[in-house]
């Protein structure tokens, strides 16, 4: 049919940028390392208790180290957190949201490192009560875990058909795997389901994860 028009409705976006400059900032990296080291130290009792229960030395296999969730308060990350905050607000405005009576604030930001002995991963999830979420990759390679985004329309899962070519992004695709490198930034709406594939523990895998919420200025 020659006059058939395609009208895109309810689009889903992931926003990507390459920002290696932060990895060249000694203060930024020192902050990342300090928070990571503390998270690893804090997990030692958990690892010991797990090994005692299982009666087997398995180290940190399958674990994921999380720092405290107020990383955005570290002054060494001030430029980074402001960039994320402003960019997130711009994204919501460009999507058509009226934010005159709202300000965007972090609910959490933490640095996360997958187990050195492999098995680190994250199951599919969303970040409820938030509006923009994202990742900034500090350490990764083509051998490490990858972020995977899933179609948020759960209803279509019942009637999905085979996909012609999984290597091509198309409306039929039910999930998309992203290839990232150190310095990659990904931003997306917090309702978008996402996960991280199982990491084999070959190379270090570490990233900053954050969530922001639009809060009313007045009630």
List the predicted regions and their residue ranges.
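Active-site region of the double-stranded beta-helix
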Residues: 75-107, 115-131, 138-145
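Short acidic, gly/pro-rich beta-turn/loop elements at beta-sheet edges
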Residues: 27, 144-146, 157-159, 198, ...
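Catalytic core of non-heme Fe(II) oxygenases with the double-stranded beta-helix
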Residues: 112-185
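Catalytic core of Fe(II)/2-oxoglutarate
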Residues: 167-219
């Amino acid at each position: 049919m020659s006059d058939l028009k395609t009208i895109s409705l309810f689009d889903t976006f992931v926003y990507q940028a390459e920002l290696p400059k932060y990895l060249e900032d000694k203060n930024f990296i020192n902050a990342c390392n300090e928070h990571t080291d503390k998270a690893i130290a804090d997990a030692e009792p958990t690892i010991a208790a797990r090994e005692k229960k299982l009666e087997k030395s398995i180290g940190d296999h399958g674990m994921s180290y999380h720092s405290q969730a107020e990383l955005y308060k570290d002054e060494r990350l001030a430029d980074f957190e402001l960039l994320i905050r402003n960019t997130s607000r711009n994204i919501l405005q460009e999507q058509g949201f009226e934010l005159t009576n709202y300000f965007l604030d972090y609910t959490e930001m933490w640095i996360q490192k997958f187990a050195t002995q492999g098995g680190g991963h994250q199951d599919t999830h969303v970040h409820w009560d938030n509006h923009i979420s994202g990742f900034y990759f500090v350490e990764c390679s083509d051998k490490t875990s990858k972020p995977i985004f899933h179609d948020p329309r759960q209803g279509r899962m019942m009637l999905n058909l085979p996909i012609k070519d999984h290597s091509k992004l198309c409306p039929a695709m039910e999930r998309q795997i992203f290839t990232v490198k150190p310095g990659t930034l990904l931003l997306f709406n917090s309702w978008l389901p996402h996960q991280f594939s199982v990491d084999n523990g070959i190379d270090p895998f570490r990233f900053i994860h954050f969530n922001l919420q639009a809060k009313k200025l007045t009630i």
